[in-house]
Amino acid sequence: MIEILDPGYYITIQDMGRFGYSNYGVPQSGCMDIVSAKNANLLLSNSINEPLFEICMMGGKFLFKKEAKISLSGALFEVLLNDKGVSNDLLIEVNKGDVLSFGRAIKGNRIYLAVKGGIDCKSVMGSSSMYRCISEDFIVRKKDVFKFSQNPSNNLSHEKVCLLYTSPSPRDRQKSRMPSSA
């Protein structure tokens, strides 16, 4: 579980959005930076559509009431876990009682906080994305508590392996032609 100690400037829960309702005047909603949101979920082997926190521009403080695996992706923010700096695009293990704090955005506007398994929240019209007049809440508030999903949708297996093959760059070729000193 995660408790919101400080809701910052503007924090919401988002997923990839709701589709097929525009003819009824319902907007797609969903995360603003799709690539970063997908990346945050994929770092945890979550489905790309798992709900996650979208933190905009500055602020936010989260208390973990249970141990969890999390990831951050997107804009470069000042982020502290128990007063120690934390980087984006890594799997981070947090313990019960840990506090994750967001300062100001250094580069970009939005950072995504994903939790292994996703956040357990109500789905409206096929999406958990917060949006005014559609979801119960449109932003997270101080003292809100969110549970981790017990039944993550389409969780990816940790056993899958991705191999990355690279070609030598011109710089690598130049280095290999240099005479070796004997």
Question: Model-found features: residue ranges?
Answer:
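A residue-level signal for beta-strand positions that form part of recognition/binding surfaces
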Residues: 1-2, 69, 145
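Extended, compositionally biased flexible segments
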Residues: 30-125
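Hydrophobic alpha-helical segments and helix pairs
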Residues: 101-156
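Solvent-exposed, charged amphipathic helical/linker segments at domain boundaries
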Residues: 161-162
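Conserved small/polar residues in nucleotide/adenosyl-binding loops
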Residues: 165-172
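Hydrophobic alpha-helical segments, chiefly the membrane-spanning helices
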Residues: 178-182
